[in-house]
Amino acid sequence: MGLPGPIHDILLVFLGSGIVLGSLGVILLTNTIYSAFSLGFVLVCISLFYILSNSYFVAAAQLLIYVGAINVLIIFAVMFMKGSEYSNDFSIWTVGDGVTSLVCTSIFFSLITTILDTSWYGIIWTTRSNQIMEQDLLSNVQQIGIHLVTDFILPFELISIVLLVALIGAIAMARQ
């Protein structure tokens, strides 16, 4: 946005304070519905940060994905969950829980050591087509698409694996 400097700074201060107050609301409010609404407020403020930095596509994705889908899903899950079922019963860990946490922790540490020990400099993942480079890309969406399949292919694939694991975990929890 082409805002003058002082107005831009004032908006940044208001959005930053909104994020801090909203995140405190997420942590400190005892009612989970109010905490979910505070989370929605924080996500909207983050989206407005993206608008201030001229990243309109990321702001729209933030609103659609996080506020529109994830936060609504959290609110519905909290509303349909029985409160007494989880508040009084604290079950003791079983052997399966210990084995699962041990396996997950070992996979996590092996991934961290692999990432830290790999020399990432000089790795060429893909090459860009000359036709794509010669074209004058018209929109930010095309630029994002080109970067996702060339420069950021490894993080893109890692995020897809994390989302797949989260989906499998959600299905496993829903079946119980």
Curated annotation (Swiss-Prot):
Molecular function terms from GO: NADH dehydrogenase (ubiquinone) activity; quinone binding
Membrane topology: Multi-pass membrane protein
Keywords (A to Z) from UniProt: Chloroplast, Membrane, NAD, NADP, Plastid, Plastoquinone, Quinone, Thylakoid, Translocase, Transmembrane, Transmembrane helix, Transport
EC nos: 7.1.1.-
Main location as per UniProt: plastid
Listed transmembrane segments: 10-30, 32-52, 61-81, 92-112, 152-172
Entry GO CC: chloroplast thylakoid membrane
Record field: catalytic activity: a plastoquinone + NADH + (n+1) H(+)(in) = a plastoquinol + NAD(+) + n H(+)(out); a plastoquinone + NADPH + (n+1) H(+)(in) = a plastoquinol + NADP(+) + n H(+)(out)
Subcellular localization(s) per the UniProt record: Plastid, Chloroplast thylakoid membrane
Pfam families to which the protein is assigned, alphabetical: Oxidored_q3
Membership in a protein family: Belongs to the complex I subunit 6 family.
Subunit annotation: NDH is composed of at least 16 different subunits, 5 of which are encoded in the nucleus.
UniProt function note: NDH shuttles electrons from NAD(P)H:plastoquinone, via FMN and iron-sulfur (Fe-S) centers, to quinones in the photosynthetic chain and possibly in a chloroplast respiratory chain. The immediate electron acceptor for the enzyme in this species is believed to be plastoquinone. Couples the redox reaction to proton translocation, and thus conserves the redox energy in a proton gradient.
Record-given protein name: NAD(P)H-quinone oxidoreductase subunit 6, chloroplastic
Gene this protein is translated from: ndhG
